[in-house]
Amino acid sequence: MGDFVISGTGGWDWFSIQLDNNTELMLYVLRDRAGATSALFGSFIMPDGTVQDIGPGSARAESTGQWLSPHTGATYPSGWLVELPEQQLVLTVTPQLQDQELYFPGAVFAGPTYWEGAVDVHVSGAGSPTGVGYVELTGYAPPVPSSQ
């Protein structure tokens, strides 16, 4: 994924979700420099291992809140509503902890600053599955300068 940052996109939001009904979702939302979604794609994996491709127009991920980093001053999305119409799923994705930002102040190799962490997932509807996952957010904060 690092090539996306080098090639000039604004960053990405990456979701890896495992539901307790043994289905999984991998979703990538790429953003342009202005912050608009430039691409959205991924895979939905059924319990039998069958993979359903998620392409343009077949999913939506919308932020439901924000978190302001006390470390870098960056504002990150915090909480999401993910809609998968073909799978008839609406997922509410919530960070298990707000402060999961990775930054490297004073490091020889500073690298990009990003947010990545554990999330809880709830599916809309009575008796619907719940799950857990992992979200990675890049492009919301400038890199921390290295010490060299």
What residues fall within each predicted segment?
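Structured soluble/peripheral alpha/beta segments that form catalytic or ligand/cofactor-binding pockets
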Residues: 1-148
